[in-house]
Every structure is written in C-alpha cells, then in structure tokens.
C-alpha cells in the first residue's frame, strides 16, 4: 500500500514538473518572440522616421556643390578676362597726340579715327572696317543725332564693336564759347550718346583741335581721354579723291609708330578706307584697338 502511495505521489510530482517546464519554455519563447517583434517594430519605426529623400540628399548636395563650383569658376574666369581686356596698353602723348606703348606692347601701331559721324557714310565705313577686322573711334556730333535714322545708325556702329567719341554737339570752336556753353557742347552730347547706346563716350576730340583749359578739365572730370591727331588730309581739295587720299595716308612722311590718323565721314574717305587699311598693314603697322588706350593715371598704376 505504501509503495502504491509513493508511486502515485512520484507520478504527480513528475507531471507537475513537466507542466512547469513547458510553461517556462512557452514564456521564454513568447518573451523572445515579443522582443523580436519589438526590435523589428522599432527598426521599422526608425526607417519610417528617416525621410525618403535622405539617401538622395548627398547626391543633390554634390550636384549643387559641383554646379556652384562651376559657376564660381566661371565668374572668376570672366572677371579675369574682363580685367585683361580692359587693361590699358597705350596712352595718348598730349605733346604730339601719338599713341605710346605703356610697357612691352607693340610700338608699331596706328590709330584710325573718323570725325563728324554719323553724317552720311559712317555706317558704311563701319561695315568696311568690320569686314577687315579692324577698329576705329567714331567721333560723333549732336547735330547728326537728331533723327531716328541717325540714332539707329549710331546704335548699329556701336553694336558692331566700335567705340564712340565725343566731338561736341554743334562742332563750334570751344575758344569762342563761354564756359557754360562749352559745358553744354560737351556734357549734353555725352548725355545724348548715353541715352542712345547706353554708355557715355570714352574719348573726346575738340572741333578743329582747339581746346581750352576749362574744356580739358571738364573732359577729365567726365572720365574721357583727350585726343587730337597726328595727320589727316581728307578735307583738302586735292585729296577729295579716293585714290589720291589712300596714297597720301599710307605714304606720307608723317606716318610713324603710334600715328593718330584723322578721317571724316565723307564719300571719298569711305571709298579709300579699305586701301588705307591694307596699305598700312602692308607696311607692318598694326591697327590699334582703341579699347587698349588708357589714361595717364591707369598707366601709372601699372608701373
């Protein structure tokens, strides 16, 4: 009897232990599953919290930085190029009105200038020079800028790349005018030119080459370069012929390094222009780009 009771108690004890082990295993399994689900849920939540564009931002930033770098580099290059283009290489010698190199610039140059524009032939003359790939200064008068046609001609000349000079409003001798009248002749023309082409003239030439102290100071205040000429012939009767004019302009004894050639808006000058340019080039003279002419102050800064 005792054996049977002990056996029954032992059996009950074993059953109880087995159930507890199963419960513990289930609890542990549930705990592990719960932790796994919690971790997966946490990871999912972290992935959802990160914006979808995050992975794209570095690429966008790199693209932006690359673009910005290219733009910055382009700006610097452009500024350096503009600076180089604007750096003067020649000045006007006011004792003889020739062009002088500032440092190691080519001394064998001549400057072409055309006065009294745009009367009748200036636009054609500009087209001829453009075709020959050379430049000249077109000195304009206010009384040739009164009509829309004349103003459009000036716009076209400027658009072709030719610098514009101030030759006064009405071509009167400055020495016969009061200071107030001189001011009007000079400044009002610069105002008019700016109104037409968007910029003021860089050069000034007085009618008949006669300046006054007041006019010279005013020109300086206006930031213009004072200029006369070294030689010219097209107003003389014997040279009012294209062939004769071309011959004297190229073969005169006055031609030398830095010569400042004066011509006018005239039919015979227009017809002689190509031969003048080619004749000068045949003598190994370079036609000077007026954009390379600076002031004495600019030259001093470079020294």
What annotation goes with each model-predicted range?
Residues 101, 146, 269-303:
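C-terminal domain-boundary segment and adjacent tail
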Residues 1-4:
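Positively charged n-region of N-terminal signal peptides that target proteins for export
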Residues 116-120, 141-149, 173-177, 205-211, ...:
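Acidic-and-aromatic substrate-binding clefts and catalytic sites of carbohydrate-active enzymes
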Residues 6, 11, 18-107:
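N-terminal, intrinsically disordered, polar/charged segments of Gram-positive cell-envelope systems
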Residues 110-113, 136-140, 163-166, 202-205, ...:
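Structural recognition of the beta-strand scaffold that forms the well-ordered cores
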Residues 172-197, 208-256:
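Alpha-helical scaffold elements lining the catalytic groove of polysaccharide deacetylases
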Residues 126, 154-155, 186-190, 273-277:
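Generic structural signal for well-ordered alpha-helices
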Residues 78-173, 192:
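Active-site beta->alpha N-cap acidic-glycine motif
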């Amino acid at each position: 009897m005792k054996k049977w009771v002990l056996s029954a108690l032992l059996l009950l004890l074993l059953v109880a232990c087995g159930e507890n082990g199963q419960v513990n295993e289930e609890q542990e399994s549930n705990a592990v599953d719960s932790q796994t689900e919690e971790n997966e849920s946490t990871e999912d939540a972290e992935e959802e919290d990160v914006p979808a564009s995050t992975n794209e931002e570095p690429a966008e930033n790199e693209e932006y930085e690359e673009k910005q770098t290219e733009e910055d580099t382009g700006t610097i290059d452009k500024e350096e190029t503009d600076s180089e283009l604007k750096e003067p290489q020649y000045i006007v010698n006011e004792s003889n009105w020739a062009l002088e190199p500032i440092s190691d610039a080519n001394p064998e140059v001549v400057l072409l200038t055309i006065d009294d524009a745009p009367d009748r032939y200036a636009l054609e003359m500009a087209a001829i020079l453009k075709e020959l790939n050379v430049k000249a200064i077109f000195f304009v008068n206010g009384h040739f800028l009164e009509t829309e046609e004349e103003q459009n001609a000036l716009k076209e000349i400027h658009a072709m790349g030719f610098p514009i000079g101030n030759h006064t409003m009405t071509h009167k001798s400055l020495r016969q005018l009061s200071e107030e009248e001189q001011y009007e002749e000079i400044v009002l023309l610069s105002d008019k030119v700016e109104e037409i082409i968007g910029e003021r003239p860089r050069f000034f030439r007085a009618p008949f080459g006669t300046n006054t102290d007041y006019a010279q100071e005013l020109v300086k205040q206006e930031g213009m370069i004072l200029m006369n000429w070294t030689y010219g012939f097209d107003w003389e009767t014997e040279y009012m012929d294209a062939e004769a004019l071309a011959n004297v302009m190229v073969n005169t004894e006055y031609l030398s390094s830095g010569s400042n050639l004066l011509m006018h808006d005239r039919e015979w000058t227009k017809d002689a222009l190509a031969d003048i340019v080619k004749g000068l080039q045949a003598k190994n003279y370079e036609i000077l780009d007026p954009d390379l002419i600076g002031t004495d102050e600019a030259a001093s800064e470079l020294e």
